[in-house]
C-alpha cells in the first residue's frame, strides 16, 4: 500500500541525528516525514546522560547557531553545567552538561511536535525504493510505502545490532529495542563499503545503595553556564552534583582474572571499539601500569535513583560486573539496576559520501550519525542537521552546502570522515581543527547564523537576537575605542593600582583591554561603563586580546582558500594524469575528492602530486575554452 501523501524528505530514525535532520528539513519549508520504530524513544540518550565536553560542545553550539534543537533541549534538561578548561584559552574551553534523561527527551519531543512541515510516523523501515540509482522512497515493516526523492538514514546502532554480555549475545538495536535486520540486509546489497564497529555502556547503579560520603563531590559551576545562545537560566531545572571515585588494585585483579570471559578478548566481538571511550577491561589491558582509573558517578535524573558510573563500560558477564562494581570505594553494597553491555553494529565507509553526506552511488540517499562511523550524540546531531539541510536543498533544486574546515567544526568533522574515512568510532576533539582559535564555541553564532538564515534554518526570534548581539559588539568596540583614560586622573590611578601597571601616556579602553593582565569586568567597573550583555562583553574581550593571533590565522586561511575552492570534476580520470604514481592515482580515484584542498589531505598524496593536478586542471580548462571558441 502507498501512503496517500508524498513527502519531500524522509528521515529514518529518531535519535540525535534523526531529530536534527527532520527539524532542519522542516524548518527549510519542505514536507518532511520522520519515521521511527517507537515514538516514545524520540531524542533518547542511549548511552551517558551528558551533552558537550571538549570539542563536542563546539558542535552543539554550531547546531544551535543553525537553529537546531540539541542546545535548547540541554538547557531545559541539564541538571549540572560546567565549563571545562576554564583556565585555558578560549579556543579549548568547553561547556558540559549533565542531563536528566526524561527532561531532555521531553524537550526534544516538544520541539518536534511543534515544528511546522514535520510529520511523525511510528514504523520500522525495512527497505528502500531505488530506481536507476536514485532513491524514491521507503518501505516499512508492515509493507506501507512512503515516497520521497530524498531519504536520510540515521540508524544509530540498530543496523545488524548484536548485544554482548559475557559470551552470551542476542540481536538488539540497544537494550530493550529490536535491531534493524531487514534494512541492514538491504543496505549490504548496495555498492557501498560496509564494516562493523562496537560501543558499550556501564552497569547502572541504584543510588540508594551507594555511600557518597567516601567519594569526592563535583558540583556544577555558579552561575550556571548555558548551552544555547538563546538559553535562559530560569528554564534550567534544579542543579545537583556528580561524584568521583576510583577503581583499585582489587578491581583490576577481578578484570584480569576474567578476560577469558570477555567477548572482546575471546574473539567473539569483531567490531572495533571507541579509542577515547574504552571499556574498563580495555583500560586495564592497555594501561597496565596504572593503579587506578577515575569513575564519575553521574545522576540519570531528578526523579530517579539510577546512577551512571562513567568510566566502567563493560561487556563482561554479570557476575563479574557485580564484583567489579562492589570492589570500588563507595559501591561496596551497590545494587545493579541494569547490566552493562557491548553492542556491535554495521557502519558504512564515509569515503563513499559527498560533502553533503549524500551517497555517491545512490542519488538522494543521505547518511548521518553512527552509520558513518562516528560516536557521540553531538557528532550525530551535527551530521543530522547537515544531511537534513542538504536533503531539503536537493528537494528545492538548490546546490548542496557544507561549511569548510575554517568555518566550523561541522566542516572539520565531515572533511575528516569523507577524506580519511575511519577504522574506529570517530570522536571530535579541538585538536582536530587547525583553526581552533577562530572556531571557538563562543562565536559559533557569529560564524554560522547568517548562513543559517540564508538557508532557511534560522527563525525570526534567533535572527533578531543575533542581529542585536552583532550590533552590540560593534557599538561596544566603538565605545571602548573612543573612551580615553589619562595618567594622573582618578580612573588612570585606579587602573594603575588595580593592575600594577602605571599609565605612561593616554590610552583608549580598547588598547588597555588588549593587555593580558586587564580584564573586561574590572575595566568596566573602574571606568563606570554602562552595562553590556555578557555575550557581547565576552566577544569584545576575546577579539581584542587575541587580535594578533586571529589575524594570523585569517591570513593563513586566505592563502589556502584558492586550493579549497578549486573543484575537481567528478569524472576526472586520474590514471590519465602523467607524473602521478600508481599509488596516488589509486588513492585519488578511490576517494574522488571534491576539491584540490581535500585531495591534499588524503594520506600519501604529496604536494608534488597536487601541483601536477593543478597543471592538469589548467590544461583541461584551456582545452575546453578552445573547443567552445572553435
UniProtKB/Swiss-Prot annotation:
HAMAP family: MnmG_GidA. NAD(+) binds at residues 273-287. Keywords: Cytoplasm, FAD, Flavoprotein, NAD, tRNA processing. One of its GO terms (molecular function) is flavin adenine dinucleotide binding. It holds the Pfam family GIDA_C_1st. It is found in: Cytoplasm. It comes from Ectopseudomonas mendocina (strain ymp) (Pseudomonas mendocina). Homodimer. Heterotetramer of two MnmE and two MnmG subunits. Its cofactor is FAD. Belongs to the MnmG family. This is tRNA uridine 5-carboxymethylaminomethyl modification enzyme MnmG. FAD binds at residues 13-18. The keyword rRNA-binding does not apply. NAD-binding protein involved in the addition of a carboxymethylaminomethyl (cmnm) group at the wobble position (U34) of certain tRNAs, forming tRNA-cmnm(5)s(2)U34. GO terms for biological process: tRNA methylation; tRNA wobble uridine modification. Disulfide bonds: none annotated. The keyword Chaperone does not apply. One of its GO terms (cellular component) is cytosol. It comes from the Bacteria. SUPFAM superfamilies: FAD/NAD(P)-binding domain.
